[in-house]
Amino acid sequence: MPSQKIRIRLKAFDHKLLDQSVGEIVDTAKRTGARVAGPIPLPTVINKYCVLRGPHVDKKSREQFEIRTHKRLIDILDPTQQTVDALMKLDLSAGVDVEIKL
């Protein structure tokens, strides 16, 4: 796999958990001899939900909730077979969504 690139995109609601997972991936890739570009922070998506506080009347009384989705992008350039094997065996946290493109 000499001229390929692995693009890893991570999403999580907790940025500390996300940064910890990114660190593990970068350390694993560098340890096996691949070049790493990133982590690149992508824009945070903020979903806001507005709900009525009371069950019956008072439309003016509302409450807002938000969910922030933090994202990071990592490019692994010139991956070796050991890099791919190490990334497959890597155990990340349950709160992190990982998308891998070759």
From Swiss-Prot:
Entries under NCBIfam families matching the protein: PRK00596.1 (NF001861), rpsJ_bact (TIGR01049)
**Taxonomic lineage from the root:** Bacteria, Pseudomonadati, Thermodesulfobacteriota, Desulfuromonadia, Geobacterales
PROSITE patterns named among the record's database cross-references: RIBOSOMAL_S10
GO terms (molecular function) for this protein are:
structural constituent of ribosome; tRNA binding
UniProt xrefs under Pfam families: Ribosomal_S10 (PF00338)
Similarity section: Belongs to the universal ribosomal protein uS10 family.
Q: Which GO terms describe its biological process?
A: translation
Organism for this UniProt entry: Geobacter sulfurreducens (strain ATCC 51573 / DSM 12127 / PCA)
Q: What's the name of its gene? A: rpsJ
What is any one of the record's Gene Ontology cellular component terms? small ribosomal subunit
Role of this protein: Involved in the binding of tRNA to the ribosomes.
SMART domains referenced in this protein's UniProt entry, alphabetically: Ribosomal_S10
Please give the HAMAP family that the UniProt record associates with this protein. Answer: Ribosomal_uS10
Keywords annotated in UniProt: Ribonucleoprotein, Ribosomal protein
Q: Describe its partners and assembly state.
A: Part of the 30S ribosomal subunit.
> What is the name listed in the Swiss-Prot or TrEMBL entry for this protein?
Small ribosomal subunit protein uS10
